[in-house]
Amino acid sequence: MICYNQQSSQPPTTKTCSEGQCYKKTWSDHRGTISERGCACPNVKPGVKISCCSSDKCNG
């Protein structure tokens, strides 16, 4: 499976993942809305939105 793994302000990059899932999580801080992408489907802190999916590059 191929997942995107860049932070919100970075150009898109991908990674081959063995976990079978990709995630995109978003949160807000003093810089505005931040997003992070990667492999698996991690637990997140309250106030962080996460969406997980299970197809190539689905977390764009």
UniProtKB/Swiss-Prot annotation:
Annotated disulfide bonds: 3-22, 17-39, 41-52, 53-58
Cell location: Secreted
Keywords recorded for this protein, A-Z: Acetylcholine receptor inhibiting toxin, Disulfide bond, Ion channel impairing toxin, Neurotoxin, Postsynaptic neurotoxin, Secreted, Toxin
Molecular function as annotated in GO: acetylcholine receptor inhibitor activity; ion channel regulator activity; toxin activity
Pfam families xrefs: Toxin_cobra-type
Tagged with keyword Disulfide bond: yes
Keyword Secreted: yes
Domain of life according to the entry: Eukaryota
Entry GO CC: extracellular region
Gene3D superfamilies attached to this UniProt entry: CD59
Free-text tissue specificity from the UniProt record: Expressed by the venom gland.
Main function: Binds to muscle nicotinic acetylcholine receptor (nAChR) and inhibit acetylcholine from binding to the receptor, thereby impairing neuromuscular transmission.
Family (UniProt): Belongs to the three-finger toxin family. Short-chain subfamily. Type I alpha-neurotoxin sub-subfamily.
Protein name in UniProt: Short neurotoxin D1
Species annotation: Micrurus pyrrhocryptus
Taxonomic lineage of the native organism: Eukaryota, Metazoa, Chordata, Craniata, Vertebrata
